Amino acid sequence: MRELILLRHAHADAAPLEGNDSDRSLSARGRAEASLAAARLLARGLVPDLALFSPAARTRETAELLRTALGLPLQAFRELAPLYLATPAVLRAQIATIDAATHRLMIIGHNPGLSELAEELDPKLRHTVLVNAGYVHVSIGGAGWRGLSEA
């Protein structure tokens, strides 16, 4: 049995009129949200073997705050360009590449893709909309990570 944690990035500052969405940094509120998410993950024993995150500043910063709070090494966190504003199909394709030795995987990314994937993976999560720094925890049976690309 594999476990997947889908975590939306924490709250970010608004983009400047001429700025890029991907350059938005976490707000003070977002930094507090990320710390609270880390505490909740720790309290539930949900420490990932591996975490993948999008290259957007807000997801990188969320990932770094989580990594530090969870006491995980740098190599346990990887940036993946395709995760930026990824659709459920792209998320599934990326997850399917994960080595079978990884039992608990975390994806730190964006809505609507994360919330839509959560709905696809677990009917109980229908109409779920992840809030900033919110997460869902899903058990993955069957063929493991590779099986997600076939669903």
Predicted segments — roles?
Residues 82-99:
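Short phosphate-binding loop-to-helix
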Residues 4, 100-109:
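Generic beta-sheet signal
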Residues 122-151:
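Domain-level recognition of soluble alpha/beta enzyme cores
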Residues 10, 83-85, 136, 141:
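Short, solvent-exposed coil/turn elements at secondary-structure transition points
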Residues 62-66, 91, 117-118:
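Hydrophobic packing residues within well-ordered alpha-helices of enzyme cores
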Residues 44-46, 98-103:
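Glycine-rich phosphate-binding loop signature in dinucleotide/nucleotide-binding domains
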Residues 3-83, 125:
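Active-site-proximal alpha-helix that buttresses catalytic centers in soluble enzyme cores
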